[in-house]
Amino acid sequence: MMASRPDCPLACPSQADLDSFRRAGVDVLAMATPAAMQVATGRIAHDGLFEPDGSGQRWFAFREEDADDMVFWQRQTGRLTSCSGRVFALGQEIINETATYSFDCALNIFADPMDWLNARRDGIVVMPNRWPAAFDRLRDCPRIAIAESLLPTYRRNMTPGRMPELYITPERRTAA
């Protein structure tokens, strides 16, 4: 996995896990593609990152190849974390894909990984501690469709982190 963190033992979801997701309306392909959902046991460490722990809680794991990271979701609590802290959003590789915006489609931003899975991973779930990076990561998206519950968070964070200091240069005027 990531060089900065210890390897995390991953397993396939149990049949009970799969049945639970199916009852919640999640399509089997959404659990398997583009990369299969896996299961890890661990906890959130003091630095806010996932730490493998055999006596910890069960977390569903999603590999984020473009960030060389892995997102962990604890379904019972709804908590999200990652292995190295490099990932911006669950499913973030879709942000820069042309097909995301073709035929007047929009980038979907979901409030919860279950909604994301029910939509067959057609969008992203922004990591809770990564919303301040939203402006830099999403400003070039032509269209965004966002969960209503996220609208205040989106509006608060879709501003540049800082603006340059501005100086006004007086124009020279000539006599007529």
List each language-model region with its residue ranges.
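Short coil/turn linker and secondary-structure boundary residues
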Residues: P13-A16, R130, I146-S149
